[in-house]
């Protein structure tokens, strides 16, 4: 659980009246504001603060969402037939632009293999 603290007594004078977030599960503190040797947002073990006394402060801490992997969606509003015709007749579609990995790209600038890959990934029978 994370709680806010203000250090009220410490052997290190730079810690007096400093503000921290205390993570009691990890036994760590994150500096919010302190004089001297500790930087804002620095995380240290509670033991590095030495002998301290503190008072708790009300703090609202929003849970952080850690996304690893995840999903990515490119929306191309086209018919399959249009893309297949662009593969066979590139001169008819010089301005045809699609989304690939978040970027806008001219369909005709892709290799034939990439064009097929786009068509296969864009048009599926089911999700």
Curated annotation (Swiss-Prot):
SUPFAM superfamilies: PFL-like glycyl radical enzymes. Keywords: Organic radical. Gene3D superfamilies: 3.20.70.20. One of its GO terms (cellular component) is cytosol. It holds the Pfam family Gly_radical. GO terms for molecular function: formate C-acetyltransferase activity. InterPro entries: Auton_GlycylRad_Cofactor, Form_AcTrfase_GR_CS, Gly_radical, Glycyl_radical_cofactor_GrcA. The modification Glycine radical is found at residue 102. It comes from the Bacteria. Residues 5-127 form the Glycine radical domain. Acts as a radical domain for damaged PFL and possibly other radical proteins. This is Autonomous glycyl radical cofactor. The lineage of its organism: Bacteria, Pseudomonadati, Pseudomonadota, Gammaproteobacteria, Pasteurellales.
């Amino acid at each position: 659980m994370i709680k806010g603290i203000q250090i009220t007594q410490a052997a290190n004078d730079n810690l007096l009246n400093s503000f921290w977030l205390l993570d009691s599960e990890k036994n760590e503190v994150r500096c919010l504001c302190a004089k001297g040797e500790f930087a804002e947002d620095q995380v240290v073990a509670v033991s590095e603060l030495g002998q301290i006394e503190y008072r708790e402060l009300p703090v609202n801490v929003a849970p952080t969402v850690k996304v690893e992997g995840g999903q990515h969606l490119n929306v191309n509003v086209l018919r399959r037939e249009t893309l297949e015709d662009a593969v066979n007749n590139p001169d008819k579609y010089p301005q045809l632009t699609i989304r690939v990995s978040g970027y806008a790209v001219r369909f005709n600038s892709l290799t034939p293999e990439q064009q097929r890959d786009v068509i296969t990934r864009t048009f599926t029978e089911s999700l």
